[in-house]
Regions:
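Linear, non-domain "peripheral" regions
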Residues: 1-72
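Extended, composition-driven regions rather than compact fold-specific motifs
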Residues: 4-22, 66-80, 84-90, 102, ...
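Intrinsically disordered, low-complexity regulatory regions in eukaryotic proteins
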Residues: 8-31, 113, 123, 193-196, ...
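A residue-identity detector for tryptophan
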Residues: 20, 51, 118, 172-175, ...
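Short low-complexity stretches enriched in small and charged residues
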Residues: 48-56, 115-120, 139, 182-184
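Secondary-structure boundary elements
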Residues: 57-127
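Solvent-exposed, polar/charged alpha-helical surfaces in well-ordered, non-transmembrane soluble domains
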Residues: 94, 98, 130, 134-141
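Hydrophobic/aromatic-rich core segments of domains that either
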Residues: 134-208
Length: 209
């Protein structure tokens, strides 16, 4: 699916609008992504996969871009939204998770013609679609930019994100004395922090902050 963009996008200063709901409230987020910014990520010669487990662990951090200006802008806006609603840390994480979950799930085969093709967060935002890896990198980037501690959770045929949130409950993975609660970025039915599919058990936990 092509993004809903205004006519200025061809000039390199367009915008993409996102709509999602969380806890019965509707949210709108306008994201400005210049063509030059998108193209720089799109044309980056980084390896896009497929990867062995060891390779995947080693390269995950490259795709988490929490210092990117677009990501910083999004994280700031979502933080403001959460403050206005008086959300707790857990609620704030879930608000950001609901945003990423609202982005269309699409397989790499459908979107890139490859079995595996990892995207940078800006690519996923611009294209308004991604698979579990793409959406996990986006969510981890936004959450890290918001000041939380995130890890990538690597499974045999899946990827998710873990976020440290003291006081939270549910499925978590331990690393370095912290509990990272499972976040399913591809869910479509309001799965929140700590809720994980039963089939995913042991994971490679990759620090990306």
């Amino acid at each position: 699916g092509q993004p809903d963009v205004d006519g200025d996008l061809e000039m390199g200063n367009g915008s993409v609008e996102y709509y999602w709901t969380y806890d019965r409230h509707a949210y709108t987020l306008l994201v400005n992504i210049g063509n030059d910014v998108y193209s720089a990520y799109r044309q980056d010669d980084v390896d896009r996969g497929p990867f062995s487990d060891d390779e995947a662990v080693g390269i995950c951090q490259t795709f988490v871009t929490s210092r990117d200006a677009v990501i910083v802008d999004i994280s700031s806006t979502i933080s403001d939204m959460a403050r206005e609603r008086g959300l707790t840390n857990e609620g704030t994480i879930n608000l950001a998770l609901a945003f990423v979950q609202s982005i269309e799930y699409a397989s790499d085969e459908a979107t890139a013609g490859h079995d595996e093709y990892w995207r940078y967060p800006v690519e996923t935002l611009y294209e308004r679609a991604g698979d579990c890896e793409d959406k996990s990198f986006l969510f981890a980037s936004v959450i890290e930019a918001m000041g939380y501690d995130a890890v990538i959770l690597l499974f045999d045929d899946h990827m998710a994100v873990g976020v440290a949130c003291p006081g939270a409950s549910g499925t978590y993975y331990s690393m370095g004395g912290s509990k990272y609660f499972y976040c399913e970025t591809t869910a479509v039915d309001d799965w929140e922090l700590g809720r994980a599919p039963e089939e995913y058990d042991s994971a490679h936990v990759v620090q990306v902050g």
